[in-house]
Amino acid sequence: MAPTQSKVRIHNLAEAHEKTLRAFPIEVEQNPEGKKLLVKQIRIRTLGHADHSNDSICFLNTYGFIKEAVSQTEFMRAGQKSESKNTLTACMLPFGPGPNIGSPQKMLEYAEDIKIHVRKTAGCKEQIVFSLDRTPQVFRGFQFPRDRYACVPSDKYIKSPGKLVAGPNYCYIITFLSLTFCPSSQKFKVPRPVLNFRSTRMRGIHLEIIMKITCSENSPIRKTLITDDLENGPKASVWIHLCNLYKGRNPIKIYDEAYFAEKCKQMLLSVGISDLWGPTIAVHANGKIPKSASLYFNSRGWALHPIADASPTMAKQLWSIGCEIMEVNAILQGSDYSALVDHPDVIYRKIRIDPAKKQYAHSKWNPFKKAISMPNLTDDSI
């Protein structure tokens, strides 16, 4: 029989981060030929006490579409415009952290000059390689333009990677820009090897984030959500690995569930959500961090967890729908798999939720429903 569970809830949100996350309102206009065009937009947010000083940084995230690039071997006469290729699928590509931008409103205009190629490859998993061929100066301080390429699992940033086949050249067209200003002290993403580490001498602490999803009643996404609470709407559960706690070797101490629950309480954890590397869970430890957990936080007690790493499917759903953090639980489990299956979960329900940053608001744009053709995703320079 499966082990029973007890829970501990976290009541407040991380300062400077919201419990909601807003998406882009969709605006459509017609060109002179009568075709419907999707209006490109930029969203600018400031978290906490971040301003345009030297102590704050800017996260840049992009949303758009992948299409087949125009062939460079076509014959063209003078004055003829290259024909648009069909849009294949929606895509998100985080540019990562960068310098503080003094005039962010102009970045949407400069984004039209960015040229990004998209290719498939394979390792132990199917992968997508984004390579930057051309970028304006204003973008070059961000992480992706500095690296010039990014290789990720194919399902991480692309809605339908199965539509990309061998042979054609593909490009990524940016339609939405999301800029988030935050203090530089909050920039810390836990290294993947640290997150994957397990040991028989450790107990693992995970966070379960329960989010209310704001989607329509006829949305196909509802089939993937928790719908047993009709009054409060559909919900989704996302788990992230927070840290490991050392059991210790002191024969006098009792390293039971109460001991680890007390350690969790002493950290005074708080949680919020923002658009950094895509939808990202921000965790702040306001109290005492155990020595064995120090690798999972920066010196200010912050840790950022992109949902695209923890749950790619859920992250892609949040491109087009809103969410609000309703509940956060800390779960204590055995770190080693053998200990995990033999011991029950201990769940701590007193994790704080930031009331200003607990929502990811609803958007009318839905990359999971082909409702409108978007021929404006053409660029003669591509």
UniProtKB/Swiss-Prot annotation:
It comes from the Viruses. One of its GO terms (cellular component) is viral envelope. GO terms for biological process: virion assembly. Keywords: Viral envelope protein, Viral matrix protein, Virion. InterPro entries: Matrix_C, Matrix_N, Matrix_Paramyxo_C, Matrix_Paramyxo_N. Its main location: virion. Signal peptide: none annotated. Pfam families: Matrix_Paramyxo_C (PF23765), Matrix_Paramyxo_N (PF00661). The keyword Isomerase does not apply. GO terms for molecular function: structural constituent of virion. It is found in: Virion. The keyword Ligase does not apply. The M protein has a crucial role in virus assembly and interacts with the RNP complex as well as with the viral membrane. Belongs to the morbillivirus/respirovirus/rubulavirus M protein family. This is Matrix protein.
